[in-house]
Amino acid sequence: MINYEYPLSERVRTLLRLEDLYDRVEYFIAKNEPLEHHVALLSIFEILEVSSRADLKSDLLQELERQKQTLEALRDNPEISEEALDNVLWQIDQASSRLFQASGKVGQELRENEWLMSIKQRTNIPGGVCEFDLPSYHYWLQQSAEQQRHDLQQWLAPFLPIRDGIMIVLKLLRESGKTSSQVAYQGVYQQMMAGRMAQMLRICLSREYPCVPEISANKYALNIRFTTQEGMQRPKAAETDVEFELTFCNL
């Protein structure tokens, strides 16, 4: 099965972008080759840009507090495991505490590092990080993998409280949804929202279908059009019925 997630708000869109970047940087930091660590640093620069939104930290803190209050209300529910509930609440408390302790603008330490910012500036130029452009960076890339990994982890560290908060919020968001089986006849599916609230849609599709969903949604209607991709040709509308699972996620 292949999962597709579609954010219905700018906030969730930002969280999904950051989640993808965190996954990427952690993957490449664990590698050993200089080019892989170069990609890790570029991903840290992207995290710096995406997380620079002024209200990101406060949004996460507010959402974590709201979820904590919601979960606390479930404490006397016999269908809820007390142990599981306590574990989630502990994770929320830990993430909130780390966010509170992260003073100032997210990533300010990196912005004040002139050497890193000189590299970041050159990355905006195609081919701008050649060794003759940035000899000091070329020298760093020739150091041991352990030294590079240590440096990268230090540069990533200021963003980890944000990552922890994002992981909890997205986990709760994904688990909030109710899944239903649907069919897109001739590759097209439409549904009136009728006041249904959702922050994210999830579409789960069997790998046997050689098609991908194109999604458009607003507060009035949801439209999904499945298209097929053949080689380098333009996508074409699917001509067969497509069975899929649809989940509306909302906190």
Residue spans of the language-model regions?
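N-terminal ordered "arm"
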Residues: 2-62
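Charged, well-structured binding/catalytic surfaces in domain cores that contact anionic ligands
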Residues: 95-200
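Extended, charged low-complexity segments
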Residues: 199-251
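Alpha-helical rod/repeat scaffolding segments in eukaryotic adaptors/tethers
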Residues: 4, 33, 78-85, 109-112, ...
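Hydrophobic/aromatic-rich structural module bridging two neighboring secondary-structure elements via a short loop
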Residues: 52-115
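Alpha-helix boundary/N-cap detector
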Residues: 9, 13-16, 59-62, 83, ...
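Charged, amphipathic alpha-helical oligomerization/scaffolding segments
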Residues: 13, 17-20, 24, 39-42, ...
